[in-house]
Amino acid sequence: MLFKQQAWLRQKLLVLGSLAVGSLLYLVARVGSLDRLQPICPIEGRLGGARTQAEFPLRALQFKRGLLHEFRKGNASKEQVRLHDLVQQLPKAIIIGVRKGGTRALLEMLNLHPAVVKASQEIHFFDNDENYGKGIEWYRKKMPFSYPQQITIEKSPAYFITEEVPERIYKMNSSIKLLIIVREPTTRAISDYTQVLEGKERKNKTYYKFEKLAIDPNTCEVNTKYKAVRTSIYTKHLERWLKYFPIEQFHVVDGDRLITEPLPELQLVEKFLNLPPRISQYNLYFNATRGFYCLRFNIIFNKCLAGSKGRIHPEVDPSVITKLRKFFHPFNQKFYQITGRTLNWP
């Protein structure tokens, strides 16, 4: 009887030991892959924090990919927040636009960087009078938890075209960094139309064809009252921003290139934000089914953008496309001149 009990005990210990070793190997593989993918950047010199790299180890990235999510959902106690030195910071950079330029893709890709924490939702603080009236503390409380050495980034594409926004952001932080992601103006306008059209179709509502909206039927000229066209006149909106911020505080991201060659564009943004280069080609892989790049955080966690990305655009009369591109051309040239970035749009 004693022999049987000892044999049973040895068997149980063997099973438990195997499970423990397996769990340990899994943990080592996971943490090792995270460290290899995104080693923590030496951010103490960049943002003036007191921590050294030794004091700011892999745990920051682990929290960023896991526990920070719990804090974001409000599942953390005040003691946990205090224990991990977590704070809700005002953004040090904002993606201000442009709608249908790739703002969501840019935000998600920048979130690959271990020193970046993104606001998950569009907050619409500066463009919405009701939200703005709630005050800056309300806005800060909408931000995700982060370490003091990390930077928070939010995006609300309506900011770029809303008249009151530049002054409001200036009053919050006159030295903030501003990201503008743009696409070829005619393509962006058609994408804008496509999103609205899809919403109408879901509600079984009829909607005019793009050609009828973009071209004034009375004059046969481009209809600048149509919002999708007006939004694509980038230089008109940028000039309003330049009344408050110098051009050095803006960085233009090529949204068309971000689709086909994301890494070079992300590296330019890292440089603009004074971030050490941490996003690599390993973080980005092409999904042939979806037709665009997806994100690889580590060997376990991958992420593709929502299915609404990469919508099929409707066929548009080539003569209308030609007319629109001719209309946008002088505005594009001025945009290149102001920003110092030539995008070679047709």
UniProtKB/Swiss-Prot annotation:
Reactions mediated catalytically: alpha-D-glucosaminyl-[heparan sulfate](n) + 3'-phosphoadenylyl sulfate = 3-sulfo-alpha-D-glucosaminyl-[heparan sulfate](n) + adenosine 3',5'-bisphosphate + H(+)
Variant or mutagenesis effect after changing R104A: Reduces enzyme activity by 93%,
Keywords: Disulfide bond, Glycoprotein, Golgi apparatus, Membrane, Signal-anchor, Transferase, Transmembrane, Transmembrane helix
Localization, UniProt: Golgi apparatus membrane
Classification via Pfam families: Sulfotransfer_1 (PF00685)
Residues exposed to the Lumenal side: 33-346
Cytoplasmic topological domain residue ranges: 1-12
UniProt main location, coarse: Golgi
Molecular functions per Gene Ontology: 3'-phosphoadenosine 5'-phosphosulfate binding; [heparan sulfate]-glucosamine 3-sulfotransferase activity
GO cellular component terms, A-Z: Golgi membrane; membrane
EC primary class: transferase
Membrane topology per record: Single-pass type II membrane protein
Enzyme Commission code: 2.8.2.23
Extent of the signal sequence: none
Database matches in SUPFAM superfamilies: P-loop containing nucleoside triphosphate hydrolases
Residues noted as binding substrate in the record, renumbered to the chain: E122, I123, H124, F125, F126, D127, N128, K155, S156, P157, A158, Y226, K227
Annotated 3'-phosphoadenylyl sulfate binding sites: K100, G101, G102, T103, R104, R183, S191, Y293, K309, G310, R311, I312, H313
Transmembrane portions of the chain: 13-32
Known function: Sulfotransferase that utilizes 3'-phospho-5'-adenylyl sulfate (PAPS) to catalyze the transfer of a sulfo group to position 3 of glucosamine residues in heparan. Catalyzes the rate limiting step in the biosynthesis of heparan sulfate (HSact). This modification is a crucial step in the biosynthesis of anticoagulant heparan sulfate as it completes the structure of the antithrombin pentasaccharide binding site. Also generates GlcUA-GlcNS or IdoUA-GlcNS and IdoUA2S-GlcNH2.
Entry protein name: Heparan sulfate glucosamine 3-O-sulfotransferase 5
Designated gene of the protein: HS3ST5
